[in-house]
Amino acid sequence: MHEVTVVGAGLVGCLAALAFADRGHKVALYDARPDLRSEAELKNASLRSINLAVSARGIEALRSVDTKMAERVLADIIPMYGRMIHDLQGGQHAQAYGLWGECINSIDRAQLNRTMLDVIEDNANITFFPEHKLTNISLSRKDKKYQRPTSTFETKEGEERVVESDYIIGADGAFSKTRDRLQRYVRMNYAQQYIDCVYLELKIPKADGPDPFSISPNHLHIWPRHKYMLIALANGDGSFTSTLFAPPALMEQVCESQNTFISFFKEQFPDAYELMGESQILESYENNPRSPLVSLKCSPYNHKGECLLVGDAAHCMVPFYGQGMNAGFEDIRVLMEILDEKKWNVEEAFNTYTERRHKDLVAIVDLAMRNYVEMSHSVVSLPYLIRKKVDGVLGRVFSSAWVPLYSMVSFRADIPYSKALSRSARQDRIIGNIVNWTSFAGLVGMGALFYYKGRHLFGRLFE
């Protein structure tokens, strides 16, 4: 039996704790925040609601740890079968995600986290320590007082707590203290990028009447406006969590005053304005921050068999592919598979994990960045729609050999991200050739038609 320290009790940290505990190991789970289930935190959560999309990779990872736990935490998901595009005139146009009726699922992040903490509380192999802020880690026996890796925490009372364990799992998010400390022990390549986009959370309240949903709950709603966009995902109570994404300069401009913000909404999202109501829009405007979006990559993820980074601590991505949580959950499934494969030789397993997982995580971080352009602009462009139509036809006709990129990423947990990306690149070249040749054939056909009609016309003129 190993003693495991998991830093960070977010979604990925909770799943990591449950996975190690399921293998019979003793887990200590630490988080800098108060318990999310406390009365004060529940009140804060009611002011802001962040929805996530859970798809095949995340569901498969949850089930790989505990099928009953997976059923419990996924009880309130809302299936989304495609995008619903809202144009400037208030028209709605559906775009299916999959070829065979597949779906991704909307889920409330805070509720999912609370449910996982409830499951953890019932597990005798896990002890949870909220309000413990990591300040340092010591590896490779640098601290002569201890024979194993140590983690140092500061409690809410300001006291120092030093914890010894067999290894440390860093799941403490994009601004990971574990990663920061780990860089003293490894030559870590690290890249961080803030994109030219900030976001503001809004809300569509539930409707009055027997149907609480004012728009379809089974679609991801998108108001694409090229350089900015609005999205909305359904909640179980009939409301929708909505998010405005825009360049910082534009966000600052439209948020200059209540009047400018309301005018912007009326002009650019007229149907969303009606759905939200002016008072709800102003409440979000006054109370919710304009938050940045960051993307990061690093490598390696580990130091020997003593410390390993997972989730956002290793690979933070922008939210436009809906894969942040799914990739983090998949980290845990892949890690457990490698540990079993290496018969729990932890150092060999951690090294293999870094080597095997890195290319997949780079692929999904890059795909997420690329998908912002698709969601905000391409979904309404004719070339994109033509290529998507061709992609779908080929996927249906050659279903065993041709899978669209979105389907590979969101519905096929058996296809690694990097393989999905390389396979998609080959398919894109084929689609490009088909579209080009079809266009060329069409032009030749039109030219022949005009030539024939022209000869016929001139022939009659000179009869």
From Swiss-Prot:
Lineage summary: Eukaryota, Fungi, Dikarya, Ascomycota, Saccharomycotina
Annotated source species: Yarrowia lipolytica (strain CLIB 122 / E 150) (Yeast)
This protein's name: Kynurenine 3-monooxygenase
GO molecular function: FAD binding; kynurenine 3-monooxygenase activity
Similarity comment: family membership: Belongs to the aromatic-ring hydroxylase family. KMO subfamily.
Cofactor(s) this protein requires: FAD
Keyword annotations of the record: FAD, Flavoprotein, Membrane, Mitochondrion, Mitochondrion outer membrane, Monooxygenase, NADP, Oxidoreductase, Pyridine nucleotide biosynthesis
UniProt GO cellular component terms: mitochondrial outer membrane
One GO term (biological process): 'de novo' NAD biosynthetic process from L-tryptophan
Subcellular locations according to the entry: Mitochondrion outer membrane
Major site of localization recorded for this protein: mitochondrion
Uppermost EC category: oxidoreductase
Pfam family, one: FAD_binding_3
Catalytic activity, as annotated: L-kynurenine + NADPH + O2 + H(+) = 3-hydroxy-L-kynurenine + NADP(+) + H2O
Pathway: Cofactor biosynthesis; NAD(+) biosynthesis; quinolinate from L-kynurenine: step 1/3
Known EC number: 1.14.13.9
SUPFAM superfamilies assigned: FAD/NAD(P)-binding domain
InterPro entries assigned to the protein according to its UniProt record, in alphabetical order: FAD-bd (IPR002938), FAD/NAD-bd_sf (IPR036188), Kynurenine_monooxygenase (IPR027545)
